[in-house]
Amino acid sequence: MTAYGHMPGEAIECLSIAVELHKQEVIDAHGQVTIRVGFKIGGGIDQDPTKAPFKYPDSGVYITNVESGSPADVAGLRKHDKILQVNGADFTMMTHDRAVKFIKQSKVLHMLVARADLPPVSLH
């Protein structure tokens, strides 16, 4: 089974990648300290995937951009990875706004992501 095209709330068995991302504190041009993760997300159970620019096959939360050299890049995240969990929270049932707020909460993100180019899981 694949994580892509998964219906929210249904059990899923797929290969996933564990990622540990340590956020980075940077000082912006105005002297303000900001916390940097280096990725953007799209999707969520409240979003219509047919209207998204990348046409993802379901309403999951996806990485839509990874900045080169950022904490996300160093941790190994890739554009189009599907976020399954962050710090134990199920992202397959999360709205977009809640996902953004959840990602902002912790300095370290322990993530499980699915990647489209991984081989399928054999149940035998």
Swiss-Prot record:
Pfam families in UniProt: PDZ (PF00595)
Gene3D superfamilies recorded: 2.30.42.10
Ranges of residues in domain PDZ: 18-106
Annotated SUPFAM superfamilies: PDZ domain-like
Top-level lineage group: Eukaryota
Coiled coil: none
Function: May regulate a number of protein-protein interactions by competing for PDZ domain binding sites.
Name of this chain's protein: Tax1-binding protein 3 homolog
The species this protein was found in: Caenorhabditis elegans
Gene that specifies this protein: txbp-3
